[in-house]
């Protein structure tokens, strides 16, 4: 599904049932869609460590549901959102699994809570080497400090198609593909390899056309356009010079995300900014891009501010 205009409110710390109660005000604030947290189970509870929700231990549709809510909660949220014209997107993780922990190869090995059929199949897992982010082959073939899946495998593709079709059955309108840049594109050729048909088979296998935006952050124009044109999906990416030089109609832009705010060190580069500064820059993004994502900082009501409402309504398209 292609949307020309979309103002997405990202509420990763909110339980689904709590979002239901906020829907009327979300609509009043000028948002058109909601992005929820990851709803797959993880290798351990993550009340404290936010990043643990991305260390999932299942990509099966039957297992959807975690601390943020159940399948029934998600179905209720979708139904209530649709009644007032809002869309619901879910953050979905299927490029990697939670690891065994520790250091060395354990960091790149699936956790023992991962289904043994998946865990014990050597054809499902990428090389146990850490990614060199300056090397495209390494990005698509090695591990991002977690146990990383080979999505050129047809069996895995079928499992992921079923996962997303389960979300579609529950009423979801789109998904954010976490760590999408780890997946090679259809016509991205590497020596002595068959091309990866993931995106083609994935989209063909879905029950209906939905919004697909893949996380492709800190990348150059060439890679962003590769996903826009070859994979034929929208790209979720941070504001950058390169983002201004690609097709803006196939971009979901953001100034701040959970990564830039919650990570330590240089990755958490918006942590030092005030909410006023973040909202001001969100306004610049809305002025320049028809599709944007507003991340609501944990334990705040930033999204409820009057200046956010004014920005959304001023740059409505």
Give the ranges of each region predicted by the language model.
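Substrate-binding/active-site clefts of carbohydrate-active enzymes
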Residues: 2-21, 29-170, 185-207, 211-214, ...
């Amino acid at each position: 599904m292609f949307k020309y205009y979309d103002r997405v409110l990202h509420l990763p710390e909110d339980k689904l049932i709590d979002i239901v109660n906020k829907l009327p005000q979300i609509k009043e604030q000028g948002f058109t869609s909601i992005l929820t947290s990851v709803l797959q189970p993880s290798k351990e509870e993550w009340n404290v460590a936010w990043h643990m929700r991305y260390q999932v231990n299942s990509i099966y549709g039957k297992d959807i549901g975690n601390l943020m809510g159940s399948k029934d909660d998600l179905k209720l949220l979708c139904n209530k959102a649709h009644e007032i014209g809002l869309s619901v997107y879910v953050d979905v993780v299927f490029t990697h699994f939670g690891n065994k922990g520790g250091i060395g190869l354990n960091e790149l090995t699936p956790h023992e809570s991962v289904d043994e059929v998946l865990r014990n199949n050597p054809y499902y897992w990428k090389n146990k080497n850490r990614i060199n982010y300056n090397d495209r082959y390494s990005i698509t073939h090695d591990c991002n400090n977690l146990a990383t899946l080979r999505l050129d495998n047809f069996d895995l593709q079928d499992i992921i198609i079923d996962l997303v079709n389960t979300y579609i059955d529950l009423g979801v309108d789109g998904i954010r593909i976490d760590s999408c840049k780890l997946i090679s594109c259809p016509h991205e050729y590497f020596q002595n390899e068959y091309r990866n048909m993931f995106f083609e088979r994935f989209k063909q296998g879905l029950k209906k056309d939905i919004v697909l935006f893949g996380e492709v952050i800190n990348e150059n124009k060439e890679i962003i356009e590769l996903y826009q044109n070859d994979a034929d999906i929208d790209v979720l990416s941070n504001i950058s010079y390169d983002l201004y030089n690609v097709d803006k109609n196939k971009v979901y832009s953001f100034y701040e995300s959970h990564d830039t705010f919650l990570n330590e060190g240089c990755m958490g580069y918006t942590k030092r900014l005030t909410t006023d500064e973040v909202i001001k820059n969100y306004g610049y993004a809305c002025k320049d891009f028809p599709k944007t994502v507003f991340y609501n900082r944990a334990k705040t009501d930033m999204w409820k501010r009057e200046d956010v409402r004014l920005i959304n309504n001023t740059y409505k398209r």
